[in-house]
């Protein structure tokens, strides 16, 4: 489930700081800090500030939190243990998985998909084009003979769906009987049909295979014409299927069928001799083929066209498919767009996409090349498009910086509803869920995405409440949990490690897709994906646990409890860093994140700082003004924190130098100096987020000069992120038990919620849109990551955050 709840540490006050206005604060003591900053370039910088203690209640010792017991492979927490090359899990196995997946992604071609007995049978029915009394594709007939299941049926051996098994089996029996071969196999197939036909009456109509009510009656008619005995043609369920087809055909506008590509073309083999449609106009229909010669990528429909017209383009398509699948044929082909989109989506959600960046770029470049103003379909160059592939394209292409507009979604909107494609009988959860996911990556003013978000959220919420989540396109036991989590954890509040942990536990290796027959796609559902995800997660988690021990040691050595920082504050800070920047090689950035956030929090909450005047700088460093009679103790506290502060900055610099091989001392000093100056000016809205983001980017090697920090786009991002996070912090400091409920209720009506939403949309646009003015994608992404952690804290209640922390950082992946 989305809550990821197993352990429940008591984080009753996870953000244990108390806001005190500047007018209410008292300053019992001040201490002049005159520090010398020595850089590796031997430059000496003098830094003089006046530091005063605020009279603030220290809540660090209040309450109690039981941290999970952590068992590590290496109990030592030496600096070397924090490096990426530490001896963790089976590196060789990870490399093996990575090679396997790289090879798969690099050889996608038109996509991998399992064979459909139904479509293969239609191809086997094609007579020799030259007029001889032999099959044009004998290898297809051979495939049928070699792939009958032990119970006499044809279909997916591991999963029984009555629609699928009966349709496949009837088609194969018709093909074998037509050519008068393998009578024994035909008899076994007929017996299976006879014994199982009644199961159609109990089958879920939501999972009826595509076009079943159109193509199954056509096959029954063909079987009857061939004189196949033993099939219960007059059974009540059979009569109901024929009646359903008649009702559907009466609603079909004949002129539309021959004018534009519609879903009916996909079931063309079921439209012959339909009274309501009359005779098919083949000269018009042949103009509706795809460039590859198929009818909406259906081998069965294309095989029927070959039988009726001997069209050379259709025949070329069938030849291509049969050669590709050694006599067999899938239910749709190609699936080049679909395979690439869903493979990238799975790799990202499993948290392993960083291993395949070149391959992912190639996949998305390919999809972008075939993007149209109407959207896309599962195969390239198709005039017929659907909302599922179009939504996934919008989301993934936009997240990776491609210039993509969502206006294609207008083609799937009618009145106030969105549909998978024109002519869809009823909507199904999985395409609408992908529409919902795409709708969250919206830019300001994109009304179509706002409408899509509202519709999809309400549609899915209603289905969840009714427990009505059977899907027309996908059979997955994890789909309900996936949808539930998607609604409970909006994209703005989603942290990469939280999403990965959830998806690892819910990734469907055995998911089955529904077409005219059931099919599987190895590039989407592969156990090697899951194996690599688990190995990598364990590796990252072990690294994070080592770092957590290091952070705790820093906490103890620095006596941070004395400055109002509790261990739960520390754990929350580390969790947010590790859940956002999780890669083992980015240890320095995580540690910089935590230490910077803790120190800036102490400085803004418990001290008042201003730059020393010239007269104050001339005073002795030991001068003390005891305003409240407790000066000596205060002086000691201040001096100790100054030592901790500069020592921690030195550690951050040293870690960064080891990681990126650069001296960042000047840059780091400069951003902290600027921030302290602003803090000293008494600004009510302290720009901690700008300081945090700049520290992370500098430690990651993304900022090499001060010019970046003064760049206009960088300043715009800083101002906007500071504003968003300041507003989110105000929400976060409200009544924590009610905040999540109020957020959901008020975000579309209350002004502050609306303002946050609009600002987040603008931030997403600034971060995701490509810019050629010197600000790298890595730099911009850090702003979004930081903003999402604040959104996460404001959105989720403390107990749920505690569950996430336990699950993500401490509980092992099984």
Swiss-Prot record:
Principal location listed in the UniProt entry: plastid
Similarity section: Belongs to the terpene synthase family.
Protein name: Syn-copalyl diphosphate synthase TPS3, chloroplastic
Residues holding Mg(2+): 386, 388
FT transit peptide: 1-52
Pathway: Secondary metabolite biosynthesis; terpenoid biosynthesis
Primary gene name: TPS3
Record function comment: Involved in the biosynthesis of labdane-type diterpenoid including cleroda-dienols, and peregrinol lactones and furan derivatives, dopaminergic diterpenoids that can bind to dopamine receptors in the human pituitary gland, have probably ability to lower prolactin levels, and are used to treat menstrual cycle disorders (e.g. premenstrual syndrome and mastodynia). Terpene synthase that produces syn-copalyl diphosophate from geranylgeranyl diphosphate (GGPP).
Subcellular localization: Plastid, Chloroplast
Source species of the chain: Vitex agnus-castus (Chaste tree)
GO CC annotations, alphabetized: chloroplast
Record's keyword terms, sorted: Chloroplast, Isomerase, Magnesium, Metal-binding, Plastid, Transit peptide
Tissue: Mostly expressed in trichomes of leaves and fruits.
Short motif DXDD motif, span: 386-389
A Pfam family assignment: Terpene_synth
Catalyzed chemical reaction(s): (2E,6E,10E)-geranylgeranyl diphosphate = 9alpha-copalyl diphosphate
């Amino acid at each position: 489930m989305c809550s990821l709840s197993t352990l429940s540490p008591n984080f009753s006050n996870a953000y244990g700081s108390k806001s005190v206005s500047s007018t209410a604060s008292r300053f019992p003591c001040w201490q002049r800090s005159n520090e010398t900053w020595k850089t590796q370039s031997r430059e000496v910088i003098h830094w003089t500030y006046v530091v005063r203690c605020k009279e603030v209640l220290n809540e660090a010792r209040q309450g109690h939190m039981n941290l999970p017991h952590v068992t590590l492979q290496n109990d030592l927490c030496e600096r070397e243990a924090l490096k990426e090359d530490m001896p963790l899990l089976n590196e060789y196995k990870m490399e093996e998985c990575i090679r396997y997946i790289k090879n798969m992604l690099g050889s996608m071609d038109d996509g991998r998909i399992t064979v459909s007995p139904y479509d293969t049978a239609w191809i086997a029915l094609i007579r020799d084009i030259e007029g001889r009394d032999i099959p044009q594709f004998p290898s297809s007939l051979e495939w049928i003979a070699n792939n009958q299941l032990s119970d006499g049926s044809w279909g997916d051996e591991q999963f029984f769906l009555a629609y699928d098994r009966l349709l496949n089996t009837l088609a194969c029996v018709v093909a074998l009987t037509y050519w008068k071969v393998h009578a024994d196999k035909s008899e076994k197939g007929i017996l299976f049909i006879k014994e199982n036909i009644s199961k159609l009456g109990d089958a879920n109509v939501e999972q009826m295979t595509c076009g079943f009510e159109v193509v199954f009656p056509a096959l029954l008619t063909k079987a009857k014409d061939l004189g196949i005995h033993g099939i219960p043609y007059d059974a009540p369920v059979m009569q109901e299927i024929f009646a359903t087809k008649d009702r559907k055909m009466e609603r079909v506008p004949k002129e539309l069928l021959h004018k534009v590509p519609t879903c009916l073309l996909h079931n063309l083999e079921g439209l012959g001799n339909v009274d309501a449609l009359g005779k098919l106009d083949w000269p018009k229909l042949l103009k509706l083929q795809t460039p590859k010669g198929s009818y909406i990528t259906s081998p069965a429909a294309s095989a029927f066209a070959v039988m009726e017209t001997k069209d050379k383009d259709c025949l070329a398509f069938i030849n291509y498919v049969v050669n590709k699948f050694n006599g067999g044929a899938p239910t749709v082909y190609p699936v080049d767009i679909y395979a690439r989109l869903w493979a990238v989506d799975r790799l990202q959600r499993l948290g392993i996409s960083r291993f395949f960046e070149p391959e992912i770029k190639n996949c998305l470049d390919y999809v972008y090349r075939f993007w149209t103003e109407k959207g896309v379909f599962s195969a390239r160059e198709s005039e017929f498009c659907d909302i599922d592939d179009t939504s996934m394209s919008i989301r993934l292409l936009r997240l990776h910086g491609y210039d993509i507009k969502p206006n294609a979604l207008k083609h799937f909107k009618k009145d106030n509803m969105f549909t998978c494609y024109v002519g869809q009988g009823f909507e199904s959860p999985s395409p609408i869920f992908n529409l919902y996911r795409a709708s969250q990556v919206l830019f300001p003013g994109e009304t179509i995405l706002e409408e899509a978000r509202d519709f999809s959220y309400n549609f899915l919420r209603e289905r969840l409440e009714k427990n009505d989540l059977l899907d027309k396109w996908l059979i997955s036991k994890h789909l309900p949990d996936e949808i539930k989590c998607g609604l409970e954890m909006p994209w703005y509040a989603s942290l990469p490690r939280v999403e990965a942990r959830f998806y690892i536990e819910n990734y469907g290796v055995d998911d089955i897709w529904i077409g005219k027959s059931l099919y599987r796609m190895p590039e989407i559902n592969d156990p090697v994906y899951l194996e690599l995800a688990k190995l990598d997660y364990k590796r990252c988690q072990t690294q994070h646990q080592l770092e957590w021990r290091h952070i705790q040691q820093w906490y103890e050595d620095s006596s941070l409890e004395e400055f109002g920082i509790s261990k739960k504050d520390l754990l929350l800070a580390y969790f947010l860093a590790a859940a956002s920047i999780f890669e083992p090689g980015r240890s320095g950035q995580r540690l910089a994140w935590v230490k910077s956030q803790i120190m800036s929090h102490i400085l803004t909450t418990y001290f008042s700082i201003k730059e020393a005047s010239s007269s104050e700088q001339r005073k002795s460093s030991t001068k003390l003004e005891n305003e409240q009679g407790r000066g000596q103790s205060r002086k000691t506290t201040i001096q100790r924190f100054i030592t901790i502060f500069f020592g921690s900055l030195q550690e951050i610099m040293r870690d960064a130098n080891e990681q990126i091989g650069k001296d960042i001392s000047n840059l780091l000093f400069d951003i902290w100096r600027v921030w302290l100056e602003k803090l000293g000016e008494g600004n009510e809205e302290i720009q901690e987020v700008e300081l945090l983001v700049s520290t992370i980017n500098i430690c990651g090697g993304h900022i090499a000069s001060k010019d970046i920090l003064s760049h206009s786009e960088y300043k715009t991002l800083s101002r906007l992120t500071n504003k968003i996070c300041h507003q989110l912090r105000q929400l976060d400091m409200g009544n924590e038990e009610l905040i999540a409920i109020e957020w959901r209720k008020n975000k579309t009506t209350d002004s502050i919620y609306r303002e946050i939403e609009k600002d987040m949309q603008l931030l997403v646009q600034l971060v995701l849109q490509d810019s050629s003015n010197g600000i790298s994608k890595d730099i911009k992404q850090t702003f979004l990551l930081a903003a999402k952690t604040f959104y996460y804290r404001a959105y989720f209640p403390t107990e749920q955050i505690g569950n996430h922390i336990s699950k993500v950082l401490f509980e092992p992946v099984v």
